[in-house]
Design a protein with these regions (language model features):
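Alpha/beta enzyme core
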Residues: 17-70, 74-85, 89-201
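N-terminal basic/disordered segments at the start of proteins
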Residues: 1-12, 18
């Protein structure tokens, strides 16, 4: 992991990082696009708001990195895609990472890459796919000194809607956070309110 990249991610005064994710189009769900239809305008607004980082996909990362000047948010690159958010769900679920995600992150001058670690009821194959992706990304991230951010997501059945919703069970999330660290996460992406509870337990 490169401390030099992390120096561009974390606020030097607070030691914290606000990473605004607008990578939702990657997952192929129409409902995720509300408010982010015009990505050039979205990125322009975020640069003006000046969070610590903006999380983008391969297709839109250049919108941020094309902005001139020193004072702009850092780039966190989304490295994986899945179809587990549908309502109703597709018959076949998948989760894959971009094969050359680390090299792309280096070329795009990202400060970190982000990958999911998901727990879905009755779908252990998705967690297995995530773990395979994380292990592959970890090996290449080490070679290029690219910080690896893992986003633990615990989901619950949405029986009425036919899909999954986020499960706020702290014990389940804590288990995934621990597993993410054991798999080599340099960074954990989470709601700060939930994170304080999982870290202190």
């Amino acid at each position: 992991m490169s401390i030099y990249r992390l120096n561009r991610l974390f606020n030097p005064e607070s030691g914290r990082a606000l990473d605004v994710a607008v990578d939702h189009g990657f997952f192929g769900e129409r409902s995720f696009l509300t408010g982010i239809e015009n990505m050039a305008a979205v990125v322009h607004a975020l640069v003006a708001a000046n969070p610590d980082a903006v999380q983008l996909t391969l297709g839109h990362a250049r919108l941020l990195q094309a902005v001139r000047g020193k004072h702009k948010p850092a780039l966190v690159l989304r490295s994986d895609v899945a179809n587990v958010y549908g309502n109703p769900l597709d018959e076949h679920l998948f989760s894959h990472h971009v094969p050359n995600a680390i090299e792309e992150a280096v070329r795009l001058d990202a400060v970190a890459i982000c990958a999911n670690l998901m727990q879905l009821p009755g779908r252990p194959e998705i967690r297995e796919a995530n773990i395979r992706s994380i292990m592959a990304l970890r090996a290449e991230a080490t070679t290029y000194a690219m910080p690896l951010m893992i986003e633990p997501l615990v989901m619950q059945d949405n029986a009425a809607g036919g899909g999954y919703m986020v499960d706020g069970d702290t014990d389940k999330i804590m288990t995934l956070v621990r597993q993410a660290r054991e798999l080599g996460a340099d960074l954990i992406k989470a709601d700060p309110r939930m994170m304080s509870r999982t870290i202190t337990r």
